[in-house]
């Protein structure tokens, strides 16, 4: 692939990730729904999607996004991102999520498939060479305590809370 096309693809992917973040931050859930892949939209109606996100309002507040490494192969892309924000309920805490955003290109437009595990698994199974030079990682959640980022690890189902 010529360098100019690759750079253009990476730029388009970054632009899509930033646009989707701003839609989520501004609670523009209808537009956010339009950026989902066809497979996601076929499984969930716009009303159900919007309603689910509206129920989460007041629990967290997004503040900013850092976009890191972008890898594009054909109609697939993975982007390293860090989302910063605050948890407002049931406790107040500053937090960040280090997560890879998965995108698929459909009808010439990049669409974010990150929350759609079925699409992501299908994407990875169909493209085993994709993670060459780009390690696929699980999301990590951090909270700030005493000025330091501490990774939050929820108890597993086998652990008991005391």
Task: Describe each region flagged by the PLM.
Residues 72-162:
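Exposed beta-sheet edge and beta->alpha loop/turn motif
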Residues 1-4:
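Repeat-mediated protein-protein interaction surfaces in helical alpha-solenoids
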Residues 14-22, 26-80:
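Short solvent-exposed beta->alpha transition segments
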């Amino acid at each position: 692939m010529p360098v100019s096309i690759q750079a253009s693809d990476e730029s388009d992917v970054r632009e899509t990730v930033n646009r989707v973040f701003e839609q989520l931050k501004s609670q523009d859930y209808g537009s956010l729904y339009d950026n989902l892949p066809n497979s996601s939209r076929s499984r969930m109606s716009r009303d159900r999607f919007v309603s689910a996100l509206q129920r989460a309002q007041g629990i967290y507040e997004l503040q900013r996004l850092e976009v890191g490494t972008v890898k594009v192969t054909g109609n697939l892309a993975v982007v390293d991102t860090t989302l910063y924000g605050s948890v407002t309920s049931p406790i107040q805490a500053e937090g960040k999520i280090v997560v890879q955003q998965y995108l698929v290109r459909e009808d010439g437009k990049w669409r974010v498939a990150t929350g759609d595990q079925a699409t992501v698994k299908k994407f990875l199974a169909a493209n085993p060479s994709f993670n060459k030079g780009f390690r696929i990682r699980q999301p990590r959640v951090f909270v700030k305590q005493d000025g330091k980022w501490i990774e939050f690890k929820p108890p597993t189902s086998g652990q008991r809370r005391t």
